[in-house]
Amino acid sequence: MPSTNPAATEIRVLLVTGAYYPEISAAGVQCRAVATALRGRVDCSVVTTSVDPALAATEIIDGVTVHRVVLDRGRRLSKVRASLRLVTCLLRAARHCDVVHIHGVSKKNVPTTVLARWLGRPLVLTLHTSGQDEPAAVRRLGRAAYRAFMSADLVLSVSPSLRERYREASGPAKQVMLTPNGIDTQRFRPAADAERLVLRRSLGWPDTQPVVLFVGFFSRDKRPDLLFRAWRRLPPGPVRPKLVYVGATGAGYYEIDESLAGRIRAEAAACGCGGDVVFAEPTNEVERYFRAADVFVLPSAREAHPLALLEAMACGLPSIATRLPGATDAIIEDGIDGRLVPVDDEAAIAGALSVLLADRGAASAMGVRARETVLERYDISKTAEKWLAAYHTVLNRN
């Protein structure tokens, strides 16, 4: 039952997301950070799917109870069993919450929405992913999915572009709150020179060779291969910058194209630069890479409100991103706290890289301004307050 004690100080919220720590997804990372920031005011629990059968079905992480339903995407019977377990898990967890908060669009949305309505729980939906969390894409999933998508009591959007697309479909009466992703600016912070040197050595990087960093899944939308081609365009110099990729390259996540990393490795070997191209699998200590690198590049063709870009900026790392209306251009002011380049323009990326690598003073100043932007607009405390306001809004309505 929902809490009826007026003296109760904590709102009980069930977060429903596609992946959660130690597995990695942008929504899951954001859920964990906000749950930590709201500790003492909001009692969060999590229902999530997992592709790792070694993880516990239920465990407590950072004081948050996490319920997992394991799914083998390659086996139809596994999907059927997982669906049944998910409904059971959702029913048990939702009975003990005041608000149900769905993150993103997936097959979990329909049963979650039905159960929330049956139990009389207000429903919040956050739009996280460009393309996937948009009305046109959800319509293709069928009438039930679209009805669930449009029926949330309150919709939150991480980016202006996602908010506008939802509003176009729902009409002006539907409230859609802009709630940008937030960053733990204590965890993601610049490293002093001595600490940075220690970090580089711990990662196996040379002390002085410049490092260009990519962080993200190896999906076609992320364009890791475009960055490789741009990196190869850099003019010859006494020291070739190292290109470091941090992100999942293999099966397990539906977004990943396994051929991308293979092609990059093959092309790097063929041109004799394989030693300067490094692949690191996903890590829950990604801040070590941001704090040790020289330049970050986000070459994506599609993003909503990219966490990796915010994390890089919070670490004072000069960053280059493709100009995506209502997404990256809502974060970066070109030439001030980062660089924006056209989508799919490897020459433009190479040119921006050349400038930042050549003028380290200007790059450093850009990194300082980038951190100031994150501190002012995207600290996790600001996101947490917006989520809390959303919970109070739907509870007051109900």
What is each residue range found by the language model?
Residues 333-335, 339-346, 355-361:
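Conserved acidic donor-binding segment of nucleotide-sugar-dependent glycosyltransferases
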